[in-house]
Each structure stands twice: as C-alpha cells, then as structure tokens.
Regions:
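Soluble periplasmic/extracytoplasmic beta-strand elements of cell-envelope proteins
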Residues: 1, 16-20, 49-53, 61-64, ...
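Surface-exposed, glycine-biased beta-strand/turn segments
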Residues: 1-46, 79
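Short alpha-helix capping/helix-loop boundary micro-motifs
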Residues: 22-23, 68-71
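Short acidic/polar mixed-charge low-complexity motifs
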Residues: 27, 56-58, 109
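Surface-exposed connector loops and short turns at secondary-structure junctions
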Residues: 28-30, 72, 111
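Zn2+-dependent peptidoglycan hydrolase active-site motif and core
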Residues: 31-67, 99
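Residue-level recognition of beta-strand microenvironments
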Residues: 40-41, 65-68, 86-89, 107
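Conserved, short, structured surface segments that act as functional micro-motifs
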Residues: 75-122
C-alpha cells in the first residue's frame, strides 16, 4: 500500500511506496536476500534503480543508488553482497538529501517492506 507524503522537491503530496533510509552518499547498499539481478535502470528523475528477483514472486527494489560496476542483469547475488552505494542522483527527491529508497514486490504487488526486514536489518 502507498503512504501519502509531502514531496519537498516537487511541492506536492504524492503516494510513496517503500521506505527511505537516510544515509551519506557513498554508503554501501547490500542485497537483502539471495537472488538474481533482474534489472539495472537509470532515469533522469529517479536516478539508478536495481531490482533483484529472489524467486517465488519476491523482488526487492533499490532506488537512488550508484550501482556497483560489476552489476549486470542475470548476475547472482547473495544476501549481504554490495550492489552499489547510496547516491544523491534522485532529482525528484533531492531536497530530502542522499538516501536509499527501498521497495518490496510480492507477486507483482508493492507491499510494506517492513514485513521482510528484521529489526536488526533496518
């Protein structure tokens, strides 16, 4: 489900799917579970997004990162592998500062990521 938040950069209320983790640019971003890199995409507004397919309908999405150089579609990753670094390349949320935007997709639907993160992983 989506949470309505005020986007300081755009000056509007908008739906927000996922969790934002504030961190310094350059902070390592790691895979939350074992899986396969489904995609690495870059857009002007959202910056770079990495999607990992964990199987059984579960995917994790990492937005506003600098992807690791060796990260390519189809590459296998393990839980804890560095997949990139936090970036400030998300132009639609730049007033929020550098942060990781994290989402979880289950069977094609975006769900609350907190249900998949242990308190020690947040």
């Amino acid at each position: 489900s989506s949470t309505v938040v005020f986007n300081k950069t755009l000056g509007i209320y908008t739906g927000h799917m996922g969790i934002d983790f504030a961190a310094d640019a350059g902070t390592n971003v790691v895979a939350v579970y074992d899986g396969t890199i489904e995609s690495v995409t870059t857009s002007y507004l959202q910056g770079t997004t990495v999607t990992i397919d964990h199987g059984n309908g579960l995917k994790s999405v990492y937005n506003s990162i600098e992807a690791a150089e060796n990260l390519t579609e189809g590459k296998a990753v393990k839980k804890g592998d560095v997949i990139g670094a936090v970036s400030d390349n998300n132009r639609q949320e730049y007033k929020d500062g550098a942060h990781l935007h994290f989402e979880v997709i289950e069977n094609g639907e975006k769900i609350d990521p907190e249900t998949y993160l242990l308190s020690s992983e947040k």
